[in-house]
């Protein structure tokens, strides 16, 4: 297959991960032209094509070198990796970045009226799941014999339909489990979205673009975790006020025009400034205290 000159990125076609992936790309300056039913979207300002596919297909597209980058949940990635390796098939990829969205957990659940005494409670039970490889690894690590009921959807109805004794499924709030008379008893895997790259080396202009995008992504993620703090402080209380500020970095101190007794303090913090701290700052004489979100950062 001929090498495409444009960077090809695979993302989930629909759902929450799709929206978050598009929002991330747009936040780093990738302008996209997307039509709802189209499987391919194009960037209008960068040489990037976006392939919108089923999330289960993304790892394989990376393993096989069909696309250059993929944004996918760690749970889907590792399930596909384990499946490939069980068949001695290629499952090579490069993990570029774990992202700050798409969080979920893979959990074991039982009917609410079941007695649970630890993982041993699953011994010899039939467990319905869409993640047989992750379940198998966990059960083997804990030496628990079990049987699998493989389902690709509606896993939570398996016990009430007498298809299985329990389930292993993704959980976010737990509301779906409760609605189906189930209780979450153990988390076996925690997942977030991540960016992966195909293992084969890329032409230089593609790799340079990926490196640039990663720098921007790091900046956006760092900005989300940071706050810009500004305040005015009396010089005589400067040491006490500085000690109250969160983080390890020292603030920038600027003189105030027409006020020789006070200075302005500016700083970026990756820790929250709680109300109690703001009240303590005010008690020490600080004023005009502002805590602002940061949209973009380059460190």
Curated annotation (Swiss-Prot):
Feedback inhibited by histidine. Pfam families: HisG, HisG_C. Keywords: Amino-acid biosynthesis, ATP-binding, Cytoplasm, Glycosyltransferase, Histidine biosynthesis, Magnesium, Metal-binding, Nucleotide-binding, Transferase. It comes from the Bacteria. It catalyses: 1-(5-phospho-beta-D-ribosyl)-ATP + diphosphate = 5-phospho-alpha-D-ribose 1-diphosphate + ATP. It is found in: Cytoplasm. Pathway: Amino-acid biosynthesis; L-histidine biosynthesis; L-histidine from 5-phospho-alpha-D-ribose 1-diphosphate: step 1/9. GO terms for biological process: L-histidine biosynthetic process. Its cofactor is Mg(2+). Its EC number is 2.4.2.17. One of its GO terms (cellular component) is cytoplasm. InterPro entries: ATP-PRT_HisG_long (IPR020621), ATP_PRibTrfase_cat (IPR013820), ATP_PRibTrfase_CS (IPR018198), ATP_PRibTrfase_HisG (IPR001348), HisG_C (IPR013115), N-reg_PII-like_a/b (IPR011322), N-reg_PII/ATP_PRibTrfase_C (IPR015867). One of its GO terms (molecular function) is ATP phosphoribosyltransferase activity. Belongs to the ATP phosphoribosyltransferase family. Long subfamily. Catalyzes the condensation of ATP and 5-phosphoribose 1-diphosphate to form N'-(5'-phosphoribosyl)-ATP (PR-ATP). Has a crucial role in the pathway because the rate of histidine biosynthesis seems to be controlled primarily by regulation of HisG enzymatic activity. This is ATP phosphoribosyltransferase. It comes from Campylobacter lari (strain RM2100 / D67 / ATCC BAA-1060). The lineage of its organism: Bacteria, Pseudomonadati, Campylobacterota, Epsilonproteobacteria, Campylobacterales. The gene is hisG.
């Amino acid at each position: 297959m001929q090498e495409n000159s444009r960077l090809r990125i695979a993302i989930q076609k629909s759902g929450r991960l799709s929206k978050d992936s598009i929002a991330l790309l747009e936040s780093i300056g990738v302008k996209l032209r997307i039509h709802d039913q189209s499987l391919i979207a194009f960037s209008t300002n960068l040489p990037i094509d976006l392939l919108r596919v089923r999330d289960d297909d993304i790892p394989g597209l990376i393993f096989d070198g069909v696309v250059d980058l993929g944004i996918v949940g760690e749970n889907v990635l590792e399930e596909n990796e384990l499946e490939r390796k069980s068949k001695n098939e290629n499952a090579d990829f490069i993990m570029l970045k774990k992202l700050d969205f798409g969080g979920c957990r893979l959990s074991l659940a039982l009917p609410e009226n079941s007695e649970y005494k630890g993982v041993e409670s699953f011994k010899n039970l039939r467990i319905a799941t869409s993640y047989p490889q992750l379940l198998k690894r966990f059960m083997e690590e804990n030496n628990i014999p079990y049987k699998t009921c493989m389902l690709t959807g509606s896993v939570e109805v398996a016990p009430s339909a007498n298809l299985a004794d329990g389930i292993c499924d993704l959980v976010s709030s737990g509301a779906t489990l409760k609605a189906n008379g189930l209780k979450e008893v153990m988390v076996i895997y925690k997942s977030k979205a991540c960016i992966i790259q195909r293992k084969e080396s890329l032409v230089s202009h593609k790799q340079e673009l990926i490196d640039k995008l990663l720098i921007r992504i790091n900046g956006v993620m760092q900005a989300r975790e940071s706050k810009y703090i500004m305040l005015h402080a009396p010089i005589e209380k400067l040491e006490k006020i500085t000690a109250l500020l969160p983080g390890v970095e020292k603030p920038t101190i600027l003189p105030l025009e027409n006020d020789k007794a006070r200075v302005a303090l500016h700083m970026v913090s990756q820790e929250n400034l709680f109300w109690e701290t703001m009240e303590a700052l005010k008690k020490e004489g600080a004023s005009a205290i502002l805590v602002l979100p940061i949209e973009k950062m380059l460190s």
